[in-house]
């Protein structure tokens, strides 16, 4: 697939997500969380292209959190943002030391790291008056999270394309919700984004997610529609076919 075809495909699916879930309103100030990875770079690049087209009227801002990880170098990232004329701020907060201190060696850092990062993101967005916080999770993240929640937590849940935070102060959006990771990888390679590796957890493999990813891949070899059907299932819920006591009062579920 050519460079333009990949970009066109991704923009199509981002626009579809924006429209299906009413993610961005006219006049919104959208804060894109840029981690330095392929997903967040792709999100920022595509949203910026859509903004420049002019059919969606919103402002965009890149928020980068420097977590004081060893070897962190954002010079190329700064150059890329300057070249694209995207306003940004790189905020330094030493969450790295906290995570290393609190989490025993060999354990996964992701949970604590994400909680600390989320708190900083929320505070910054509120202080600066941003109306939307954009995250780079894509289709593969959503369906993998669904199975991980079922297999390991006993819950039917995932990552919604649009979410009101628990404190009701922030709206999170995931414009890449319909985009496949393989297309994002192609796009990131073509764009030659100056990626920044995560030295905190980048070397740690999330074994649960890797197993689920392999399972979905194996099933897709037998039936290519499996991933898209899983995504469709997230918006095609049949509560009457489930067994949640919070949805139904089974004691009183009788024929009159």
From Swiss-Prot:
Its cofactor is Mg(2+); [4Fe-4S] cluster. Pathway: tRNA modification. A motif (PP-loop motif) lies at residues 35-40. Its EC number is 2.8.1.-. It comes from the Bacteria. [4Fe-4S] cluster binds at residues 110, 113, 201. The keyword Chloroplast does not apply. GO terms for cellular component: cytoplasm. Binds 1 [4Fe-4S] cluster per subunit. The cluster is chelated by three Cys residues, the fourth Fe has a free coordination site that may bind a sulfur atom transferred from the persulfide of IscS. GO terms for molecular function: 4 iron, 4 sulfur cluster binding; ATP binding; magnesium ion binding; sulfurtransferase activity; tRNA binding. It catalyses: cytidine(32) in tRNA + S-sulfanyl-L-cysteinyl-[cysteine desulfurase] + AH2 + ATP = 2-thiocytidine(32) in tRNA + L-cysteinyl-[cysteine desulfurase] + A + AMP + diphosphate + H(+). PANTHER family: AMINOTRAN_5 DOMAIN-CONTAINING PROTEIN, SULFURTRANSFERASE-RELATED. The thiolation reaction likely consists of two steps: a first activation step by ATP to form an adenylated intermediate of the target base of tRNA, and a second nucleophilic substitution step of the sulfur (S) atom supplied by the hydrosulfide attached to the Fe-S cluster. Catalyzes the ATP-dependent 2-thiolation of cytidine in position 32 of tRNA, to form 2-thiocytidine (s(2)C32). The sulfur atoms are provided by the cysteine/cysteine desulfurase (IscS) system. Belongs to the TtcA family. Homodimer. This is tRNA-cytidine(32) 2-sulfurtransferase. It comes from Coxiella burnetii (strain CbuK_Q154) (Coxiella burnetii (strain Q154)).
């Amino acid at each position: 697939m050519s460079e333009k075809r990949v970009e066109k495909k991704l923009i199509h699916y981002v626009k579809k997500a924006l429209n299906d879930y009413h993610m961005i309103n006219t006049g919104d100030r959208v804060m894109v969380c840029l981690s330095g990875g392929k997903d967040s770079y792709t999100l920022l690049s595509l949203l910026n292209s859509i903004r420049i087209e002019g059919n969606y009227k919103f402002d965009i801002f890149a928020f980068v959190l420097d977590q004081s990880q060893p070897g962190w170098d954002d010079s190329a990232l700064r150059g890329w943002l300057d070249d694209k004329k995207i306003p940004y701020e790189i905020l330094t907060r030493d969450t790295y030391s906290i995570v290393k201190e609190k989490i025993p060696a060999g354990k996964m850092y992701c949970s604590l790291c994400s909680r600390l990062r989320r708190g900083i993101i929320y505070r910054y967005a509120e202080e600066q008056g941003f109306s939307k916080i954009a995250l780079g999770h894509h289709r593969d993240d959503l369906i993998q999270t669904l199975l991980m929640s079922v297999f390991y937590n006993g819950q039917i849940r995932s990552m919604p394309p649009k979410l009101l935070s628990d404190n009701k102060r922030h709206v999170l959006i995931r414009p890449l919700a319909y985009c496949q990771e393989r297309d994002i990888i192609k796009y990131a390679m073509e764009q030659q984004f100056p990626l920044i590796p995560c030295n905190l957890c980048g070397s740690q493999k999330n074994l649960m997610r890797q197993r689920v990813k392999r399972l979905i891949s194996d099933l897709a070899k037998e039936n290519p529609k499996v991933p898209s059907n899983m995504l469709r299932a997230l918006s095609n819920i049949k509560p009457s076919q489930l067994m949640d006591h919070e949805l139904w009062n089974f004691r009183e579920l009788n024929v009159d």
